[in-house]
C-alpha cells in the first residue's frame, strides 16, 4: 500500500487533500493539462494529526502526533505500455519532482524527512532510479544538510529501501 494511502487512513490528511479548492484548482487542472507523466505540482499539508495505527485492525494512538505532508504524484511507469516512456524523459521527470519535494520541505523548515518509495511499489518504478535521484540531491547536491534526520519508510518497500541504503552509503 502506498505511503500516502496509509497517512490518509491514519490521520486527517484525506480531509486536507479533498478540500474543494484543491479539487477545483489542482486535481481537475492536473487531469486536463498534464501529459502521461502527470503533474509536477506539490501539495503541502502542514500539521496533519496522526491519530491511529495503520495496522489491519487500526488502533488509536495513545499520543497522537503532528506531521507536515508533501504530496506529489509519482509518474506512472506501466511496463505494459504500447509506447514506453524514454528513459531520459523518465529520469528527468523524477529528478525534477524529487528536487521540488526537497525544496518545498526545506522552504517550510522541515527538520525530519521520511522518504517514501515514490512509485517503486504498485507503479513498478525502478528502485535504482528513484534512489539514485534522491542520492543525487541529498548527497551530491548537499540537500541532506538541511535536515536533522532522513528516514526511510521502514514498514514498506524493502526492495526500494535496500537500493536507497546502498546508494546513500556511497557518500563521498
Language-model features: where?
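Macrodomain-like recognition of ADP-ribose-binding/processing modules
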Residues: 1-113, 117-172
